[in-house]
Curated annotation (Swiss-Prot):
Residues 292-302 have a biased composition (Acidic residues). It is found in: Nucleus. The gene is MED4. One of its GO terms (molecular function) is transcription coregulator activity. This is Mediator of RNA polymerase II transcription subunit 4. It comes from Scheffersomyces stipitis (strain ATCC 58785 / CBS 6054 / NBRC 10063 / NRRL Y-11545). Component of the Mediator complex. Belongs to the Mediator complex subunit 4 family. The keyword NADP does not apply. One of its GO terms (biological process) is regulation of transcription by RNA polymerase II. The keyword Nucleus applies.
Amino acid sequence: MFPHKKNDPLKSLPISRVGSSQRLNQHISSIPSTPNYVASSLNPVRNLPVSSGSIKSKITTKAALDKFEQLPIVKQVGAFEDTLNAISDNISQFKEGQLHANVEKIIAINDDLKSKIEELDRHRRLGENIKELEAESSNLDNTSKYILKELISYRNELRALPRLPASASKGSGDTVEIEDILKYAMKLAKFTKAPATSASMPFQIHPNNYVWPAEDALRRGMLAASSLNPDEIIANELGTTEEEKIQEKKDEQVKKADKQQDTGIRRGSFGDYGSSSSGKKKEEQSAQLDLDLFDSEDEFSD
């Protein structure tokens, strides 16, 4: 058996506002506590803003943590905490000598932190811009990859199409003058016609309705013009020059003159037996040929 405990009249007992039975039946989760939206000095962690970055921190390794602690603003925050703890110790221990120095130190750290917080805000905005640019860059990368994939698929489809057989004999590459081509085309144009398929094409003008003469008319005209000067055509085909033609004409004229002289000499040697009769015949022929069908005096005779 436990010994009986005597009541101490000098000891005060806690007074509860809730009955004992109600306290025993109360669930642990229903204990009243400070709400999340109310700032509490007893729980300063609740004063921090809750965001996706704080819930899932990017610091996952010891090296990342050391790098984070080496930042200047983090060092100043640590110094601010240490100074604040020193001030609280001075107040609790009534050390007035160090209190004034610690207060001045914490004020200087606070002013420096204000300027750094403004820079931190600027860096935060820059970080948001960097994230937007990274997202845009990733979208552009995805779009470029999609375009490249489509181009590769189109290239494969084009390569799968049948190809024309490669010509075994390629052109020698010799250049041909335009004048030679035009001359050859003019020669072919005299003896060629339009293909038969062009006659059945819609809105096709018949060759007979052209402004210029048809091919048959051109050929007939060329044949008629060539029949008037056969000697020149033969000379052109044989390749004789103009000097040779002139020389041949001179030779022919000389031969004709020699023949006329020979005939006159021969007639004079045999005598002028038939001169009177030939003169009469010439006069009769000239009289018969000199027919003046238009007489100007007949108009005024009436």
